Amino acid sequence: MDSRLNPFQDKMEKTLNNLEEEYAGIRAGRANPHILDKLRVDYYGTPSPIQSVANVSVPEPRMIQIQPWEASMVKEIEKAINCSDIGINPTNDGKLIRLVFPELTEERRKDLAKDIKKKGEEAKVAVRNIRRDAIDSIKKTGKEEGISEDEIKGLEDDAQKLTDKFVAKVDAAVDAKCKEILTV
C-alpha cells in the first residue's frame, strides 16, 4: 500500500472505531458497563466520568453495581443516570447504586437491530466519502507532481481496495452486533 494513502486509512480506522464504540453502548439484554461511558457527574465542580469517582462492576448478568468512593457522590451519580437517556432507573440504598436491566422484548430487539444497521450504513457512507477524498487528493497531487496516469490509476485502485476492506469490516461489526441483539 502506498504511503500516500496512510492518512485516509487512519480516517477509515477512526470511523470503524467510532462505530464499535457506539455499538459498545447498545445494551443487548445484558449489563454492559460501557453504557455509562458518556455519563458525567459533577465532582467538586468538574464534570467527571462515573468510572473515575466510583467502582463499576457487573455482579450479575443483568445488573450493574456502582459503588462511589465518596458517600456524597451517590446522589450525584443517581441524578446523572436519571437525566441520561439509557432508559434504566437506578435503585439507591445509600451506599450502592444498582441498575437492573430488564429482558428485551422481541419488538425492542428488532428496533435495536434497525438502529445498528442504520449506524453501520452511516459508517459505510463515511468510509466511501473518505475514499472520494483520497481519489480527489490523488488526482490533484498527481497533476501537480507530474505522476503518470497509470500510477494514478493504481493509487485509485488501492484506495478502492482499502475501502472494500473497511466496508467488509463494518459489515462484520453490524452482523456481529445484530446477532448479539437478536439472540434471546
UniProtKB/Swiss-Prot annotation:
Q: Tell me which domain of life the UniProt entry assigns to the organism this sequence originates from.
A: Bacteria
Keyword hit for Nuclease: no
Subcellular location(s) per record: Cytoplasm
UniProt-listed CDD domains: RRF (cd00520)
What keywords tag this UniProt record? Cytoplasm, Protein biosynthesis
The primary location reported for this protein is cytoplasm
Pfam families in the record, alphabetically?
Answer: RRF
GO MF annotations for this entry? ribosomal large subunit binding
List GO terms (cellular component aspect): cytoplasm
* Cytoplasm listed as a keyword: yes
Any one GO biological process: translational termination
**What role does this protein play?**
Responsible for the release of ribosomes from messenger RNA at the termination of protein biosynthesis. May increase the efficiency of translation by recycling ribosomes from one round of translation to another.
Family, similarity comment: Belongs to the RRF family.
The name under which this protein is listed is Ribosome-recycling factor
